[in-house]
Amino acid sequence: MSEEELGKLNEKMEAIIGLSKAPSQNIVFFSLLGTGKTMTVGEISSEVGLTSKATERAVAKLLEKELIQRAPFRARSYSCDSKEILLGLLVTVQNLKERLDKRGL
């Protein structure tokens, strides 16, 4: 994996950590990640109990952060790449372990 790819993964992991400060984005992200489904804004709204407008704003922000993607095969639908998120988490854990090892912890 290139340094650029690692950098992008680290940025995404930081963005995920930052979702705790954005409750609507947090709930939409984890709903898409947890279900593994491709969903429309209306479906996401029903799933998580947010208004359509709040869901639209959350989806727009998550797209901007590249934490979710537009589904290529279903109009106005979104999904979350769980494999990419898992890879990012593994890289983050590996980095954390290396830092702890350097400190002798």
Language-model features: locations:
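Short, Lys/Arg-enriched N-terminal segment that forms or immediately precedes the first helix
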Residues: 2-18
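A short acidic, leucine-rich amphipathic alpha-helix
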Residues: 43-46
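Pre-recognition alpha-helix immediately N-terminal to the DNA-recognition helix
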Residues: 26-31
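Short, cationic-aromatic polyanion-contact patches
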Residues: 15-25, 40, 73-95
